[in-house]
Amino acid sequence: SSAASDVYKRQVSSFGSYAYSENEDTFFIDLYAGGTVKTEKGITLTCETDFPHGGTAKYTIKGEAETTVAIRIPAWSEKSLLTVNGEAVDLNAVTKDGYAYITRAWKDGDTLALTMDMTPHVVYASAKIAADSGKVCVQRGALVYCAEEVDNGKVLPLYVKAGAEPKALDFEPETLGGIVPVEICLLYTSPSPRDV
């Protein structure tokens, strides 16, 4: 419909305001999107990334300015590594409210690189929501994998084995427009395969 098309156009045209924001003293990186952006302080950041399938986002600086760059450290990444010009930054010392704040005199060619933990893990639904009680999904980075009955038929007799650790497989560019499949051990508890 025309209305849906207009909403899509507005969202696409406003993507930059979701990816980056800026106030008088800090430039915020909210999303790890490839491309180039110029700050009000006069430096330009170019991002090379393999996100969301990979866990790296590297920003190369062009220009010079003394300012703060704050990059979002995602809560799902248990072991993030942030470097400036290849040297590790102590995230505990610079992180506040989910952002790592780096204040320095940025110079032409400086790099800011974030490596995120992409280890897949099982996420259990809240028991407070009766309809979801006992259900799980697998999360790898920002992506959530699940098998829903509407897409897969009756999957209720399948259970994630206690202590099962999901494993990420190799990237498959032709599957679902490109995806890293995740493998996990399931238990089948129905007496007959016909029940699935």
Predicted segment positions?
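Surface-exposed beta-strand/loop patches in extracellular or lumenal glycoproteins
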Residues: 66-74
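C-terminal beta-rich recognition modules with glycine/proline-rich loops and embedded aromatic residues
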Residues: 1-62, 95, 104, 111, ...
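Solvent-exposed beta-strand/loop surfaces of large extracellular or lumenal domains
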Residues: 77-103, 122-128
